[in-house]
Regions:
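Iron-sulfur (Fe-S) cluster-binding segments and ferredoxin-like electron-carrier domains
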Residues: 18-28
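Auxiliary Fe-S-binding modules of radical SAM enzymes
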Residues: 164-279
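Non-heme iron-sulfur electron-transfer modules
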Residues: 28-34
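Conserved AdoMet/S-adenosylmethionine-binding subsite of the radical SAM
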Residues: 35-49, 58-203
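Short, internal active-site loops enriched in acidic
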Residues: 57-58, 88, 217-222
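N-terminal pre-triad scaffold of radical SAM enzymes
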Residues: 1-17
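Short glycine-rich or small-residue beta-strand-to-loop segments that form or flank ligand, phosphate
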Residues: 4, 51-53
Length: 279
């Protein structure tokens, strides 16, 4: 679930998908709203991950952040906590020793950074990122493809290689959301997929982000993947690689496919699928 704990940001991005919500001077969620959110998470055991967002969660004070993380970590079924933040980009001095201690205390806490251009990976930003990962806080990056800003494979590969060198995993490469006033910043799906297609030929899997689009009206994320399959014949599939090389892949006959022993994992899986609350 997404837990919005503030509407304040350290910088207000022109392409923000929540511009209707941010900047309303609510530095921290009202206490009654906070208690209601915590109670909701407690009462829904299907919730395994909580994403702290806003606004930027790292604009709140250390004591408040410690309280939020502590309350979430006390909920037995919450396994992973994520924090989405632009602070490592625009205000890396926020990554203090005290902050790192708080994040480490409530592990596992993942920091989801938002670097969009290789020029944003400054020496100060690099120092903040290394302080996080050196202390066991995993960092993953979510970038947005922006027309006229970073919509070229040369820029995307430079960004992701620099981040990976700093032990930051490139995670998402988002299609810019159709927010009001952002048409001039949006790339076409075709152009975005062509960027991804070129990256696959020149980046390792570790450096490769997942191209994704947020479907409007609550449809959730959908991966955008170039289709390399050219034909099928029975158990044989034909592919054309990113470099234009044609190849075929022969699958085992269906009668040779065996189901593994599932034990208690099947019950866990069925519970996950039947949970009414998305995780």
């Amino acid at each position: 679930v997404l837990f919005l704990i503030t509407d304040i940001c350290s910088v207000y991005c022109r392409f923000c998908t929540r511009k209707h919500f941010t900047g309303q001077e609510q530095a921290f969620i009202r206490n009654d709203e906070y208690e209601k959110a915590i109670a909701y998470i407690k009462s829904h055991p299907g919730i395994r991950e909580v994403i702290l967002s806003g606004g930027d969660p790292l604009t709140v004070g250390d004591a408040q952040l410690d309280r939020v993380l502590g309350d979430l970590r006390a909920i037995e079924h919450v396994e992973i906590i994520r924090i989405g933040s632009r602070m490592p980009v625009v205000c890396p001095m926020r990554i203090t020793d005290d902050l790192v201690k708080i994040l480490k205390k409530h592990k596992p806490v993942f920091l989801m950074s938002h670097f969009n251009h290789p020029n944003e990976v400054t020496a100060e930003a690099a120092a903040g990122l290394e302080k996080l990962v050196d202390n066991g806080v995993p960092v993953m990056n979510q970038m947005v493809l922006l027309n006229g800003v970073n919509n070229h494979p040369a820029l995307v590969q430079a960004l992701n290689r620099r981040l990976l060198f700093l032990r930051v995993k490139p995670y998402y490469m988002f299609q810019c959301d159709p927010s009001q006033g952002t048409d001039h910043l949006r790339t076409s799906i075709e152009d975005s997929m062509e960027i991804q297609r070129e990256l696959w030929g020149h980046l390792s899997g570790l450096a490769m982000p997942n191209l994704s689009v947020d479907i409007p009206d609550g449809g959730g994320k959908t991966y955008l993947v170039p289709n390399y399959e050219t034909a099928r014949e029975g158990n044989t599939r034909y592919y054309k690689g990113w470099d234009g090389v044609d190849a075929k892949y022969v699958s085992p006959a269906p009668e040779k496919i065996k189901k593994p022993e599932l034990h208690h994992y099947l019950e866990e899986w069925n519970n996950l699928k039947s949970a009414k609350t998305p995780v």
